[in-house]
Amino acid sequence: MVAVIIKGNEVAEKKRAQLTEEVVKLKEQGIVPGLAVILVGEDPASRSYVKGKEKGCEQVGIYSELIEFPETITEERLLAEIDRLNGDDRINGILVQLPLPKHIEEKAIIERISPEKDVDGFHPISVGRMMTGQDTFLPCTPHGIVELVKETNLDISGKHVVVIGRSNIVGKPVGQLFLNENATVTYCHSKTQNMKELTKLADILIVAVGRPKMVTADYIKEGAVVIDVGVNRLETGKLCGDVDFDNVLDVAGYITPVPKGVGPMTITMLLHNTVESAKRAGVVCK
């Protein structure tokens, strides 16, 4: 049996086409969704991510604004900019590209963004709403992962989901989203003993640890859905995930590739959240 490849880029394109239609309808009502992205410093990876977000906005018809600051910006000045954007009716979503310089406290910056414009889903209020199953902006990568699993037509309810990784951005929230879908969730991390015994029980295995090709066929239950969140660059310059793709292909039922797996879904869910925020605000642009 060879696993079915879940092509995240194709799923993302399908969802972006739906978002484009929604944006057209909103614009007919005078509502233009707007996203502001704040970039601090000259980190090439951050700039590349921001470019992808701008391109996504342009594709679906969202107004986007890039606000750039030098690495020397003070925390106070950055907080003042967020306050300005919180009060700007043209902006439905505010995103601060992480990481930030060491002299700026990320927690203070994230908490300053209005929960109504927190399209990244990182604000403690958004996290609390997600934990309690309330309607909120879901974190983009975890939300994208759940959508990819749903593409397999597998009924998530009652399934055993194992998450390798416990970061605040992916590991912890993705487990909670599957719990909200009535799955049974197990977390594995660097201190977990007998990890393979646990992962072999997984109907759905999520891997987000940042270790190239860590997960091999002996981690996988036959027929499982395997979602590889890792993006690692090998010495050859080639990208690979946390899962040894070729090794696992004959055991898994479904698997995401790297690249063109989870990555395209992250920006797509950000666009989704921005459109949702515009719908909720319902502000007609003058």
From Swiss-Prot:
Binding site for NADP(+): G165, R166, S167, S190, V231
One cellular-component annotation, GO: cytosol
Single GO term (MF): methylenetetrahydrofolate dehydrogenase (NADP+) activity
Entry keywords, A to Z: Amino-acid biosynthesis, Histidine biosynthesis, Hydrolase, Methionine biosynthesis, Multifunctional enzyme, NADP, One-carbon metabolism, Oxidoreductase, Purine biosynthesis
Cited NCBIfam families: PRK10792.1, PRK14186.1
Assembly: Homodimer.
UniProt family annotation: Belongs to the tetrahydrofolate dehydrogenase/cyclohydrolase family.
Protein name: Bifunctional protein FolD
Lineage summary: Bacteria, Bacillati, Bacillota, Bacilli, Bacillales
